Amino acid sequence: MMKDKLIREECGERLDDLQCDGLYLIQNPDKFCFGIDAVLLSNFVKVKKDGYAVDLCTGSGIVPILLSTKTKAKKITGIEIQSDIADMASRSVSYNKLDEKIDIINDDISNALKYIKHSCVDTVCVNPPYMKDMAAIKNPDLPLAIARHELLTDLESVINIANKLLKENGRFFMIHRPSRLSEIFASMRQNRIEPKRIRFIHSYIDSKANLVLIEGLKGSGVWLDVEPPLAVYKEKNVYTDEVLKIYGR
């Protein structure tokens, strides 16, 4: 298939340069475009050489596509419930000629074991909906509401399926809101995933954290490393040097 046939401009789609090893992503601004949280997550994730990684709630496929160059994973699977978003992700994979390395599954993450064997995954990562179904005002646009609110999945379901997919000593990575950290830790432990590493993300170094990166290890003992905080901006609309480095600039 010709590359220009993969982008449906008549439907509002565009091709975005990820400025990372010549990678591109097909997106539709009328649906949901990736944010800095996906970029930070992909930079935080670790996959062993020739390992198998699964990205839950993959959306546009941004995390698998970035992991294809940021890690030495042999195989990466993204799972996305919204069919039109999953289709865009699949076409982005094809545009970047990554079909042999990345596959996109269009289904509910609760059905992951229909496609992936139990306890066979080295790394599971996820940038899930942050807000509970009844929390905050839902976006009237359904694709955006699904991406932001726990309408079709929830925190417990995400961590439960991660446990089922992971090998013993497999790694789990998540980005979420600090306000839900106690819930996250409780659910991880209930599912035998011990929190191992966290890093708080701040808009500015002197502001409250608004995101947190979390790493867990399945079946591990108890210890936790809190990394130095990451500030996104040094002044209004100006990224810090570390964030610029993450973006490859």
List PLM regions with ranges.
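Conserved Class I SAM-dependent methyltransferase catalytic core
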Residues: 152-209
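SAM/dcSAM-binding transferase cores
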Residues: 208-249
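Short, structurally constrained coil/turn elements
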Residues: 19, 98, 189-192
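Conserved SAM/SAH cofactor-binding pocket of Class I
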Residues: 44-137
